[in-house]
């Protein structure tokens, strides 16, 4: 495995979100929210899983990789290992709710745990390329270790 994508669902309509996934040829989505719920009903876990499956994209929720609760280190490590396992077979994106991976401050900082917590752990497991999909579909890459983070 050399590449993993990240995305935040934000306020997208499902059709727009699906278009972003298809644009990047995503085959599997790993939900890295602590709880697979959203005020946007299309992003509630069971609904999202069904919508993705109907469009040929796999889905798995790994709450132990969420940023809202502090998981046991061994649970978090197991979750990250599971992401790498899935990504070794399928083009994979990890998803949380935050649409922008970086803040808009003068000195950008991690805006979500995909950048501040998960990306460094994925890189430590040999993932060489992490591509963050922006709300407009543009891919960006950066060295997450240089970005200030609260995670």
Predicted features along the sequence, with ranges:
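Residues lining hydrophobic/aromatic ligand-binding pockets adjacent to catalytic sites
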Residues: 1-151
